[in-house]
Amino acid sequence: MAKVQYYGTGRRKKSIARVRLVPGEGKVLINKRDEEEYFGLETLRVIVNQPLVLTGTKDKFDVLVNVYGGGLTGQAGAIRHGISRALLKADESLRPELKKAGFLTRDPRMKERKKYGLKKARRAPQFSKR
């Protein structure tokens, strides 16, 4: 018999997370590593688990994640987005609370490009009057 799996793709800045929810006891594996090992900071682990805690499904699913690109904070946001989308496929009735918390919204903020004549996106070279 085929196992029931729910897929979701999440994005944040330059990070892309492919999330798979499998019925289980609440383990989170990120790139084949435990979440404590992958994310050193507690705040990042909290971000990843927010949709599961909010919907009360923390102990119902094992979360298997492939994530690449960007930094750790962007990856945590992408995983949260992906888990939220996968939870919707598992149970559509969770949509109102996930939407109210803002977990289904793709954060549109991206890094601003560097402009020529400037040191960074907006930082101008030091101005000297004389």
Curated annotation (Swiss-Prot):
Identify the stretch annotated as signal peptide in this record.
Answer: none
- Record's compositionally biased regions (Basic and acidic residues): 101-110
> Which PROSITE patterns does the entry link to?
RIBOSOMAL_S9
A GO CC term attached to the entry:
cytosolic small ribosomal subunit
According to the UniProt entry, which residue ranges have a biased composition of type Basic residues?
A: 111-130
According to the UniProt entry, its GO molecular function terms are: RNA binding; structural constituent of ribosome
Q: What are the BP-aspect GO terms?
A: translation
Disordered: annotated span: 101-130
What InterPro entries does UniProt report for this protein, alphabetically? Ribosomal_Su5_D2-typ_SF (IPR020568), Ribosomal_uS9 (IPR000754), Ribosomal_uS9_bac/plastid (IPR023035), Ribosomal_uS9_CS (IPR020574), Ribsml_uS5_D2-typ_fold_subgr (IPR014721)
The answer to keyword Ribonucleoprotein applying to this record is yes
Tell me which UniProt keywords the record has, alphabetically. Ribonucleoprotein, Ribosomal protein
* Family, per entry: Belongs to the universal ribosomal protein uS9 family.
Q: What is this protein called?
A: Small ribosomal subunit protein uS9
Native species: Clostridium tetani (strain Massachusetts / E88)
Q: What is the lineage of its organism?
A: Bacteria, Bacillati, Bacillota, Clostridia, Eubacteriales
Q: Which gene encodes it?
A: rpsI
